[in-house]
């Protein structure tokens, strides 16, 4: 018997470059928080941390206040495979984090044992889907009507590092 399928070649799939934002677009997004309200400051901080650290949205959602060292902007992150690693915040993100923590900790309804960094309006830990929604709605408030997911910010982080000559391996 002849296996006629062995004469066929499979089609080559196109490799797509990941979506990313240009540095000028990130400057618009990170210009400043829309207001000093709890939700606007939280949403802005989400962008700051995603972009300056390259975290996955799942890592961001699981950040704990107890694993933050405010003094030097050090965050302990639990990533894929339950592995811990340390990331550092830039100056802008550190300042925003300090402002956010003051607002977060002064909320009346807040259960003081709640350790999640990012909280909803009901003072519960934000879910991954909740963060994805907040990213989209914050961009709408800024008048940026592109579909940008938290993962696009991760790609932007890596792309901008590469463009600056960093080795990201």
Feature roles, as predicted:
Residues 1-169:
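Conserved catalytic core of the tyrosine transesterase superfamily
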């Amino acid at each position: 018997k002849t296996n006629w399928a062995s004469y066929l070649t499979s089609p080559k799939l196109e490799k797509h470059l990941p979506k990313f934002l240009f540095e000028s677009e990130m400057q618009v997004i990170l210009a400043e928080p829309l207001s000093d309200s709890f939700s606007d400051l939280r949403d802005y901080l989400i962008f700051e941390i995603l972009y300056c650290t390259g975290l996955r949205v799942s890592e961001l959602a699981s950040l704990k206040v107890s694993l933050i060292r405010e003094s030097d902007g050090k965050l302990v992150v639990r990533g894929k495979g339950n592995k811990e690693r340390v990331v550092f915040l830039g100056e802008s993100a550190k300042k925003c984090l300090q402002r956010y923590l003051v607002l977060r900790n002064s909320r009346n309804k807040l259960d003081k044992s709640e350790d999640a960094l990012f909280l909803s309006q009901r003072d519960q830990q934000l879910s991954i889907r909740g963060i994805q929604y907040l990213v989209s709605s914050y961009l709408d408030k800024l008048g940026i009507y592109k579909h940008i997911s938290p993962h696009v910010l991760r790609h932007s982080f890596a792309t901008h590092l590469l463009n600056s000559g960093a080795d990201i391996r």
